[in-house]
């Protein structure tokens, strides 16, 4: 992958294939190897990252157009901060679930460990809109981790 990303023509061809095939796995691989992406193709990959809804992974927001910047801002949390103390950005699926729950729609969510379900739980606890929230976790370790993480919202 590194070899492909460092070569302009190969990198551009990869971006084209990702776009045509809607290949999320390949795009994730590009994100993981961002430091190797040819400088002149980075804006193309930034557009792809944005179009796939991977907003938290946008590295070079200055190359995005106004509409893309607006979509990126729309996916930001009002309550949670990221490591640089800016507002945390949800990816497309997280924002979709956040909106459903905000509109009082009941959901059952099954997603991989890395999806960010715990982040959504933290978002709703941080809002302090509810006095009682029930959180069901599959293991004692995860229950304890969640309890420690949410303790900062205790009044």
Region locations from a protein language model:
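N-terminal helicase ATP-binding lobe
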Residues: 1-155
């Amino acid at each position: 992958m590194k070899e492909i990303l460092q070569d302009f023509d190969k990198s551009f061809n990869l971006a084209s294939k990702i776009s045509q095939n809607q290949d999320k796995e390949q795009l994730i691989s590009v994100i993981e190897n961002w430091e190797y992406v040819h400088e002149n193709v980075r804006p193309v990959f930034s557009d792809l990252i944005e179009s796939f809804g991977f907003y938290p992974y946008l590295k070079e927001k200055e190359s995005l157009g106004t509409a893309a910047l607006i979509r990126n801002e729309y996916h930001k949390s009002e309550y949670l901060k990221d490591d640089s103390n800016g507002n945390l950005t949800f990816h497309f699926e997280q924002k979709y679930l956040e909106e459903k729950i905000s509109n009082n729609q009941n959901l059952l969510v099954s997603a991989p460990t890395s999806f960010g379900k715990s982040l959504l739980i933290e978002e709703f606890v941080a809002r302090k809109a509810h006095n009682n929230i029930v959180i069901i976790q599959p293991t004692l370790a995860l229950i304890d981790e969640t309890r420690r993480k949410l303790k900062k919202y205790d009044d």
